[in-house]
């Protein structure tokens, strides 16, 4: 659907941008196993999160241009604390990196194909819109007309949709929320792509050229739903699509009617992901290959995140798994679930938790909030 905003009762000033932070916290403690991998093992030593962290952050937002201060509300502080904690938690973990060989080849081809595109459709995961955009995206697109699609809109709340719509609207970016599985928003996306590139044939006529189809490229990270959207637009399965990263490995142009050509492209990731908090979120949302991460590490971080997100909380974790979260230690929670349900297999327990999240078993959960 198009981004439709609910009325906001108290809009904040446009230039609120400065922050004064005062932070006190008891840090998590981490222990890295001293055991070494065996000769037959390609995995690094196992890493265990041992302790929890209790953080208290007071934030005052200041707008120097208008001379007054605004207190950040409790929800904003909670999210800022959580983002800070995620970065702390990931320091002890093996870095999450995934760059299969076909991506380098595809990146070169994509830059060439961009020259042919009238409009570019960037698809992101609505649960983590900031973590699912390529750092080179703006440089690649330049001044080309652009549509931002936040897919999996069925997995976030109406409030989250409104907040993200406001955030991107302020940047002048056209946003459509879609559900690639059910096709919601897909046809509206096709109409918008045609309308944005409507002047293409007008210019061609002025030059005495025949009209041609509008060319729209669909690009984005792995497994964010690019191929599924194309299949919904075409109303038949033309592009290979599956709920895992790396299925699409080659670029493919397909026709939508007489006047729109669509380019399906493989998921594009940077060669190195410097922001490991973002990398963990990619792993949680299944937007990066499974070989890139340790399931128990990622599930442990997810448990700690869910416990801190108001829409979920430790109570929801207990109600689902009948396990108390002790000391905000997600790794211990995963291990206990493994003992209770899977004969001590922590990997299977981690897989269950991640699968439950990916299937929406915890309700509408966004793992990111728009920056203040």
Curated annotation (Swiss-Prot):
Entry annotated with the keyword Transferase: no
Subcellular location: Plastid, Chloroplast
Keywords: Chloroplast, GTP-binding, Nucleotide-binding, Plastid, Transit peptide
GO cellular component: chloroplast
Transit peptide, residue positions per record: 1-33
CP-type G domain mapped to chain residues: 107-271
Highest taxon listed in the record's lineage: Eukaryota
GO MF term (any one): GTPase activity
Motif (DARXP motif): 125-129
CDD domains on file: YlqF
Record SUPFAM superfamilies: P-loop containing nucleoside triphosphate hydrolases
Nucleotide-binding among keywords: yes
Residue numbers binding GTP: 151-154, 223-228, 267
Sequence similarity: Belongs to the TRAFAC class YlqF/YawG GTPase family.
Job description of the protein: GTPase that may function in chloroplast ribosome assembly.
Record's comment describing the protein's domains: In contrast to other GTP-binding proteins, this family is characterized by a circular permutation of the GTPase motifs described by a G4-G1-G3 pattern. The DARXP motif is also sometime designated as G6 region.
Designated name of the protein: DAR GTPase 3, chloroplastic
Organism name: Arabidopsis thaliana
């Amino acid at each position: 659907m198009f981004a439709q905003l609910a009325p906001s009762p108290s809009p904040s000033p446009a230039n609120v941008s400065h922050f004064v932070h005062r932070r006190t916290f008891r840090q998590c403690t981490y222990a890295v196993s001293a055991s070494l991998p065996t000769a037959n093992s390609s995995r690094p030593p196992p890493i265990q999160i041992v302790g929890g962290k209790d953080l208290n952050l007071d934030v005052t937002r200041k707008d120097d241009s208008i001379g007054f201060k605004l207190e950040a509300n409790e929800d904003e502080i909670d999210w800022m604390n959580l983002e800070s904690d995620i970065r702390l938690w990931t320091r002890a973990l093996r870095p999450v990196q995934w760059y299969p060989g076909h991506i380098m080849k595809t990146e070169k081809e994509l830059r060439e194909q961009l020259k042919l595109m009238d409009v570019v459709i960037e698809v992101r995961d609505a649960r983590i819109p900031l973590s699912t955009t390529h750092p080179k995206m703006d440089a690649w697109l330049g001044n080309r007309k652009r549509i931002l699609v936040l897919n999996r809109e069925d997995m976030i709340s109406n409030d989250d949709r409104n907040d993200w719509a406001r955030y991107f609207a302020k940047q002048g970016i056209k946003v459509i929320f879609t559900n690639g599985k059910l096709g919601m928003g897909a046809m509206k996306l096709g109409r918008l792509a045609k309308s944005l590139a409507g002047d293409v044939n007008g210019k061609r006529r002025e030059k005495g050229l025949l009209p041609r189809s509008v060319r729209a490229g669909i690009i984005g990270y792995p497994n964010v739903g690019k191929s599924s959207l194309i299949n919904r637009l075409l109303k038949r399965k033309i592009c290979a699509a599956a709920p895992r990263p790396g299925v699409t490995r080659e670029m493919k142009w397909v026709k939508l009617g007489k006047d729109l050509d669509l380019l399906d492209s493989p998921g594009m990731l940077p060669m190195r992901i410097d922001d490991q908090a973002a990398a963990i979120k990619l792993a949680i949302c299944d937007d990066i290959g499974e070989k890139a991460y340790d399931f128990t590490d990622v599930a442990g971080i997810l448990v700690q995140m869910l416990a801190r997100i108001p829409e979920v909380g430790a109570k929801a974790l207990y109600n689902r798994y009948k396990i108390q979260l002790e000391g905000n230690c997600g790794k211990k929670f995963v291990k206990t679930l493994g003992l209770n349900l899977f004969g001590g297999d922590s990997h299977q327990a981690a897989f269950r938790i991640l699968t439950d999240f990916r299937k929406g078993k915890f309700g509408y959960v966004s793992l990111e909030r728009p920056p203040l």
